[in-house]
């Protein structure tokens, strides 16, 4: 009986992926507080768990569906609410994606192509950066790859159950990140139509049934929430009508393409007109002794570091990574997990819309290192199929699946008006797969042909190396120019070797492997930068701009003011909420670290129309809340803010600042979408 042997190279690749995704996360005290607060709240009741409530009292939800947060909450219930316990699921998903890609490529293209695909996936910088956070996208990609695996099996085995499972997994993915999950639908439908061996009538019938299942699963949670009485559930965060369906197809749908048009506040983001934002680089991050809380007895968060000053006195508008932006110019602006935006499409450091957007310095370092190689490899696959259609039919169909994933997604990000850099992880699987497939096809053309097609491999190596040098040229202020010149010389040298030793078969395969190693040198370093320098938990990114950034200079997080906390606890007379504030940024640390219920009256960035003045009056009259912590530069929910200031008694910071040392680096200051601003406490009875 023939036994299956483990692929030692795959084991090493998986270990490398696990190392990049997990190393030091147990010592990392930073996480996306928006989601971490939700997980903490979701551990406290099934009501909060089902609705993905941001706060313990179930006032407002986060702006994403709950499936990934459900997984994180289960881990938190088992291991306690730590940063590492909510990051581990995404780290494991990142490793799982590498394995699934290997398993998908190997049967058709061989072990060599599968190894390369897995390695490129493991070394994709943005994939590593996202997998080291509690953001949702790594789990989303894993789920879509799992669905892709089922789709391939459906075609090969001809069984409807695998097709239904594949589309059901897209429906599950919709309940992770909404419309982003549907980006792979064209690839799924096209591949089944061209690759399945059943009749056209049966193909259409099977696809229609699968799409019905997909639709039902996708909308199941949204319909369940929207059908519930608004008084019996939390408000749907970042929606304007308290509807999950509106959130899915508006804020998390069309606005991602055309630019954010809802939930904007002039004082917070100054975004609608693309105006200037407050510089965040000179803002100090919290550096107190950290706050502890008990979930299963001994959970704690460690010390928080100080955000860096930009080198050479340079500044960057809302530089999410801290440190110096590429080329020493103005850093990209960033938005939070649920907000920020406007129609200024360059606000989030995503470059200028256009067909070459993925090749611009703003995005290329995150995802595009192997993009030229994969595109030229796709050309090689098409040439091989054209010359031998019968022999390469199956290979071409699978190649088209990855191309149909790559092209629409790349096209979307080339023109989209509202997204963050870490969304580009959606491009990691097709680029990695086409890199492996491209190596397979171009090496065969290189070895077996004497015409122009045999030069595709040397051309791919040279063009990709030149492009990587171009990417590096934007970072000379961080890493110098030596790396750029060394890579250029190595790329030129290996290209010349491929040309001169083309007919020396004993060396040809070794040369192609060496050429790939050269092309992966810089992605290895880029992928390691979150480990080396600390990443940004809210807006993950990789690159040397993180150097010296101390936990990413995370602007969308804040700390507990222990003096304020002591004062509010002392004067609480049974109110359900310790205090109310406008944004989740201010509320989150009190929920996470202190087990307190804090009301975020305006959702993530303070602009959600959750309460009217009369509804707020009712809450105050019922004794549910009486203290309000407001920021001076908040213009969201202006009616509420004006009413509170007019009818409330201002509590000066002198009354609570001396009662206990504050863990904030700046007394009474607020950080977040509106930058740094003075906060004032009001009492309304």
Swiss-Prot record:
<feature type="compositionally biased region" description="Gly residues">
    <location>
        <begin position="318"/>
        <end position="343"/>
    </location>
</feature>
<feature type="transmembrane region" description="Helical">
    <location>
        <begin position="455"/>
        <end position="475"/>
    </location>
</feature>
<comment type="similarity">
    <text>Belongs to the glycosyltransferase 39 family.</text>
</comment>
<dbReference type="Pfam" id="PF13231">
    <property type="entry name" value="PMT_2"/>
</dbReference>
<keyword id="KW-0472">Membrane</keyword>
<feature type="compositionally biased region" description="Low complexity">
    <location>
        <begin position="654"/>
        <end position="665"/>
    </location>
</feature>
<feature type="transmembrane region" description="Helical">
    <location>
        <begin position="109"/>
        <end position="129"/>
    </location>
</feature>
<protein>
    <recommendedName>
        <fullName>Putative mannosyltransferase YycA</fullName>
        <ecNumber>2.4.1.-</ecNumber>
    </recommendedName>
</protein>
<feature type="transmembrane region" description="Helical">
    <location>
        <begin position="154"/>
        <end position="174"/>
    </location>
</feature>
<dbReference type="GO" id="GO:0010041">
    <property type="term" value="P:response to iron(III) ion"/>
</dbReference>
<feature type="transmembrane region" description="Helical">
    <location>
        <begin position="399"/>
        <end position="419"/>
    </location>
</feature>
<keyword id="KW-0808">Transferase</keyword>
<feature type="compositionally biased region" description="Low complexity">
    <location>
        <begin position="287"/>
        <end position="303"/>
    </location>
</feature>
<feature type="transmembrane region" description="Helical">
    <location>
        <begin position="68"/>
        <end position="88"/>
    </location>
</feature>
<feature type="region of interest" description="Disordered">
    <location>
        <begin position="269"/>
        <end position="347"/>
    </location>
</feature>
<feature type="transmembrane region" description="Helical">
    <location>
        <begin position="479"/>
        <end position="499"/>
    </location>
</feature>
<keyword id="KW-0328">Glycosyltransferase</keyword>
<feature type="region of interest" description="Disordered">
    <location>
        <begin position="652"/>
        <end position="685"/>
    </location>
</feature>
<dbReference type="InterPro" id="IPR050297">
    <property type="entry name" value="LipidA_mod_glycosyltrf_83"/>
</dbReference>
<keyword id="KW-0812">Transmembrane</keyword>
<feature type="transmembrane region" description="Helical">
    <location>
        <begin position="573"/>
        <end position="593"/>
    </location>
</feature>
<dbReference type="GO" id="GO:0005886">
    <property type="term" value="C:plasma membrane"/>
</dbReference>
<feature type="transmembrane region" description="Helical">
    <location>
        <begin position="176"/>
        <end position="196"/>
    </location>
</feature>
<feature type="transmembrane region" description="Helical">
    <location>
        <begin position="513"/>
        <end position="533"/>
    </location>
</feature>
<feature type="compositionally biased region" description="Polar residues">
    <location>
        <begin position="277"/>
        <end position="286"/>
    </location>
</feature>
<keyword id="KW-1133">Transmembrane helix</keyword>
<feature type="transmembrane region" description="Helical">
    <location>
        <begin position="204"/>
        <end position="224"/>
    </location>
</feature>
<feature type="compositionally biased region" description="Polar residues">
    <location>
        <begin position="676"/>
        <end position="685"/>
    </location>
</feature>
<dbReference type="InterPro" id="IPR038731">
    <property type="entry name" value="RgtA/B/C-like"/>
</dbReference>
<dbReference type="GO" id="GO:0016763">
    <property type="term" value="F:pentosyltransferase activity"/>
</dbReference>
<dbReference type="Pfam" id="PF24878">
    <property type="entry name" value="YkcB_C"/>
</dbReference>
<feature type="transmembrane region" description="Helical">
    <location>
        <begin position="6"/>
        <end position="26"/>
    </location>
</feature>
<dbReference type="GO" id="GO:0009103">
    <property type="term" value="P:lipopolysaccharide biosynthetic process"/>
</dbReference>
<keyword id="KW-1003">Cell membrane</keyword>
<feature type="transmembrane region" description="Helical">
    <location>
        <begin position="363"/>
        <end position="383"/>
    </location>
</feature>
<feature type="transmembrane region" description="Helical">
    <location>
        <begin position="422"/>
        <end position="442"/>
    </location>
</feature>
<dbReference type="InterPro" id="IPR056785">
    <property type="entry name" value="YkcA/B-like_C"/>
</dbReference>
